[in-house]
């Protein structure tokens, strides 16, 4: 198969913009049932670990336009204090994004279908994602309550660690958005793969929106030896 046939996705960096709605949980480490690579350890502070799950709407002006459901945990590199977000589950509705995400950043993208609905007067966003057999992966209901003035955007670092080609890789994007606190959040059914994060049936500590975000995401790079 030719190079053109095997790499049908845009080269990094990807320039992304759109809307993000997500929730963060603080959990007992024993609730989290995902298997981490040997190079990574769950980051535990005061007996608690952190998990995230949320919906993203990559809108026109992005390298690719698609929807996404993403979940993961905060980890640290073995024998190091380097910490980052580790993507354990991720679904998109674009084949180019799926292939590019797997091959450029090592994230385990799969395909799903999405329903998004915005209700601007009430500042409400609802969403659902499901796979081809009809299984619901997650639902979301967010209503913004307070936050930065909409025109004001603050930078938030977004470090990521993943395994790629059998070794740890890192990527780091800066996420510029108007951050808003939300009522509601991401809801995960007990039979969803995301339930392995320990978040099904648990209330998040915070739900938020990153409105009108912009992000520049360079290709993942191998982590230099830390031993």
Question: Over which residues does each language-model region extend?
Answer:
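Aromatic- and glycine-enriched beta-alpha-beta binding-site module
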Residues: 54-133
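N-terminal domain-onset segments
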Residues: 1-68, 78, 201-204, 218-220, ...
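Generic detector of short, locally flexible boundary/turn motifs and exposed helical patches
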Residues: 35-40, 50-55, 78-81, 89-95, ...
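Short beta-strand element of the conserved SAM-dependent methyltransferase core
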Residues: 21-27, 71-73, 180-187
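Interaction-surface and assembly-scaffold signal
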Residues: 2-4, 99-227
């Amino acid at each position: 198969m030719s190079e053109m046939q095997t790499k049908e996705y845009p080269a990094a960096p990807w320039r992304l913009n759109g809307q993000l709605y997500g929730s963060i949980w603080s959990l007992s480490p024993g609730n989290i049932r995902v298997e981490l690579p040997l190079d990574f350890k769950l980051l535990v502070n005061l007996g608690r670990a952190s998990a995230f799950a949320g919906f993203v709407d990559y809108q026109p002006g992005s390298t690719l336009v698609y929807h996404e459901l993403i979940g993961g945990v905060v980890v640290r590199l073995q024998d190091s204090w380097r910490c980052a977000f580790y993507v354990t589950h991720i679904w998109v509705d674009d084949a180019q994004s799926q292939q590019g995400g797997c091959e450029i950043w090592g994230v385990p993208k799969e395909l799903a279908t999405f329903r998004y609905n915005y209700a601007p007067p009430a500042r409400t966003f609802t969403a659902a994602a499901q796979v081809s057999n009809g299984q619901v992966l997650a639902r979301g209901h967010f209503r913004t309550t307070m936050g930065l003035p909409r025109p004001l955007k603050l930078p938030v670092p977004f470090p990521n660690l993943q395994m790629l080609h059998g070794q740890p890789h890192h990527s780091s994007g800066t996420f510029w958005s108007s951050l808003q606190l939300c009522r509601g959040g991401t809801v995960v059914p007990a039979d969803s793969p995301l339930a392995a994060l320990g978040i099904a049936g648990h209330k998040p500590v915070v739900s938020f929106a990153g409105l009108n975000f912009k992000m520049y995401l360079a290709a993942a790079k191998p982590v230099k030896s830390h031993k």
